[in-house]
Regions:
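C-terminal interaction segment
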Residues: 1-55, 59-106
Length: 106
């Protein structure tokens, strides 16, 4: 399964064969976002996020507009929970300057 949003560093993307770039690429993204919908199981999405991290993802955001919570996943760090939507998420050193204003999802 693919995430709702993903990003791969250009250097890693360029290492793929052209034919792999033109289809569902066999690469784990560096960054993913999953946005929970009413039909999604939170536990299944959390499991999916863990799989991304196990496969080399560096930053993952599980955004739950239903409960207005966001779960931030990073390698070798406990999952950080943002408990309100009055904050901005930052791409940090992986995506300098990238921010997502959670208030826009209310």
């Amino acid at each position: 399964r693919s995430p709702d949003v993903s990003w791969v560093r250009k250097t890693r993307w360029d290492e793929l064969r052209l034919e792999d770039q033109e289809k569902f690429a066999p690469i784990c993204p560096d960054f993913v976002i999953e946005l929970r919908s009413k039909s999604d199981s939170l536990s299944q999405l959390k499991s999916k996020m863990e799989k991304w991290m196990e496969n080399g993802c560096e930053l993952a955001w599980l955004i739950d507009p239903i409960q207005q919570k966001t779960y931030i996943y990073q390698p070798n760090v406990a999952v950080y929970e943002v408990t309100d939507f009055d904050q901005k998420l930052s791409g940090g050193t992986l995506l300098p300057g990238f921010e997502l204003d959670l208030a826009r999802l209310k």
